UniProtKB/Swiss-Prot annotation:
Residues that coordinate or bind S-adenosyl-L-homocysteine: Y18, C62, N67, D101, L102, S140, F141
Entry keyword set: Alkaloid metabolism, Magnesium, Metal-binding, Methyltransferase, S-adenosyl-L-methionine, Transferase
Gene3D superfamilies according to UniProt: Methyltransferase, alpha-helical capping domain, Vaccinia Virus protein VP39
Name assigned to this protein: Probable caffeine synthase 3
Site, as annotated: Involved in substrate discrimination: H155, I267, E344
Length: 385
C-alpha cells in the first residue's frame, strides 16, 4: 500500500477519530493567532494584485474535524480585523479558502460542517453567505497544488514534520536494518540514520518552499507551525513513548522483532537552525518572524470542544487520565499507518502501553512538545522592486 494511503488521521466522528481528539491542536492555533493577525496585516499592506477583491488563501494539511474550520475562522477574522484597523472603507473582499490534504483525508466530515459555519460567520462577523468560499484541493503539499502566482496567503499547522517517504538507506547492502528497535530518528539512532532523516527532510522542505514560491504572488505570505527539536529537559517525546510501547510488545512476545525493525515512521522534527538554513539556502523567501514555544503534550486535556478550560476537579489532575488523553490523540494520528504494518488487532495494546509510559512522564512534570512558528514572505521579483 502506498504511503499516502495510510499517512492520514482517523476520519469520522468516533472515539478514536481525529475530530474527537484534537484539543491540543486547538491550543496551538490559539497560540499562533496573534502572529497570524500580524502576518495578515503585513499581507494587506503589501497591496498585492486583486487583494481588495478576492483574497486567495490555503490551509496545507488541513486534516478534518472542528480544527479545520477553526483555522479558516481565524484567518477570516484576522483579515476583517486588520482591514477595520486600517480603516479600509472598500467593500469587503471575497475570501476564497482552499483546504488541502491527502486524498484519504475525511473531507466529507468537513463539508457537513459548512452550512452551520457559514451561518455562524454571518452572525458573528457580518459576512454574508458567499463572501467566504471554501473548497477542497486534495493532494500532497510535497507536489504542486495551485497555478503559478495565484495565491496570496498559505498556512500550515503541524504538517511539515511528515516526510514524503521513509528515508532511503535505512537498510544496509547486506539487508541489515540500520535503525534497529527504533521507529524514527531518535537521539539513540545511529548517525547514518539521523543523517538519512535529515537529508530527506531537507529535500522535502526545499521542494515545498520552491513549489510554494511558484504558487504565491510576489510578496505573498506563508505562516508555518511545526514541531521542532526539543532539549533534554523536555523528557521523552511522544514518538519515544510509542517506540517504547512497541518494544514492550516485542519483549513480551506479542510482536516479532523483525516486524519492529522494518517499521520506520516518515516524520522528522527539525531544529530551528536546520529550518533556517534550508529557507536561506532555497532562497525564495525572507524570514519575517520566528518564535519557539513549549506545550505539555497533555495540555489539551483541560480543553473542551469549544477550546474553553474545564473545571479543575481531581479527575483532571490525574496523570493516568491525562496519559489516556494523550494516547487517544496519538492513536487518532498514527493508527492508520500502525494498523497497516502491525495489524489492527494489536492497536489497543500499543496505546494501552503508551498510556502507561506517558503517565510516568507526566507524573515527573515532564513531557513537552517544542514548537516553531515561522512567518515567511516571498521575495519580490526584480521587476517588482
Amino acid at each position: 500500500m502506498e504511503l499516502q494511503e495510510v499517512l492520514h488521521m482517523n476520519g469520522g466522528e468516533g472515539d478514536a477519530s481525529y475530530a474527537k481528539n484534537s484539543s491540543f491542536n486547538q491550543l496551538v492555533l490559539a497560540k499562533v493567532k496573534p502572529v497570524l493577525e500580524q502576518c495578515v496585516g503585513e499581507l494587506l499592506r503589501a497591496n498585492l494584485p486583486n487583494i481588495n477583491k478576492c483574497i486567495k488563501v490555503a490551509d496545507l494539511g488541513c486534516a478534518s474535524g472542528p480544527n479545520t474550520l477553526l483555522t479558516v475562522r481565524d484567518i477570516v477574522q484576522s483579515i476583517d480585523k486588520v482591514r477595520q484597523e486600517m480603516k479600509n472603507e472598500l467593500e469587503r473582499p471575497t475570501i476564497q479558502v482552499f483546504l488541502t490534504d491527502l486524498f484519504q483525508n475525511d473531507f466529507n466530515s468537513v463539508f457537513m460542517l459548512l452550512p452551520s459555519f457559514y451561518r455562524k460567520l454571518e452572525k458573528e462577523n457580518g459576512r454574508k453567505i458567499g463572501s467566504c468560499l471554501i473548497a477542497a484541493m486534495p493532494g500532497s503539499f510535497h507536489g504542486r497544488l495551485f497555478p503559478e502566482e495565484s495565491m496570496h496567503f498559505l498556512h500550515s499547522s503541524y504538517s511539515l514534520q511528515f516526510l514524503s517517504q521513509v528515508p532511503s538507506g535505512l537498510v544496509t547492502e547486506l539487508g541489515i536494518t540500520a535503525n534497529k528497535r527504533s521507529i524514527y530518528s531518535s537521539k539513540a539512532s545511529p548517525p547514518p540514520v539521523q543523517k538519512a532523516y535529515l537529508d530527506q527532510f531537507t529535500k522535502d522542505f526545499t521542494t515545498f518552499l520552491r513549489i510554494r514560491s511558484e504558487e504565491l504572488l510576489s510578496r505573498g505570505r506563508m505562516l508555518l507551525t511545526c514541531i521542532c527539536k526539543g532539549d533534554e529537559f523536555d523528557g521523552p517525546n511522544t514518538m519515544d513513548l510509542l517506540e517504547m510501547a512497541i518494544n514492550d510488545l516485542v519483549v513480551e512476545g506479542h510482536l516479532e522483532e523483525e516486524k519492529l525493525d522494518s517499521f520506520n515512521v516518515p516524520i522528522y522534527a527539525a531544529s530551528v537552525e536546520e529550518l533556517k538554513c534550508i529557507v536561506e539556502e532555497e532562497g525564495s523567501f525572507e524570514i519575517l518572524y520566528l518564535e519557539t514555544f513549549k506545550l505539555r503534550y497533555d495540555a489539551g486535556f483541560s480543553i473542551d470542544d469549544d477550546c474553553q478550560v474545564r473545571s479543575h476537579s481531581p479527575e483532571y489532575s490525574d496523570e493516568h487520565a491525562r496519559a489516556a488523553h494523550v494516547a487517544s490523540l496519538l492513536r487518532s494520528v498514527y493508527e492508520p499507518i500502525l494498523a497497516n504494518h502491525f495489524g489492527e488487532a494489536i492497536i489497543p495494546d500499543i496505546f494501552h502501553r503508551f498510556a502507561t509510559n506517558a503517565a510516568k512522564v507526566i507524573r515527573l512534570g515532564k513531557g513537552f512538545y517544542n514548537n516553531l512558528i515561522i512567518s515567511l514572505a516571498k521575495k519580490p521579483e526584480k521587476s517588482d522592486i
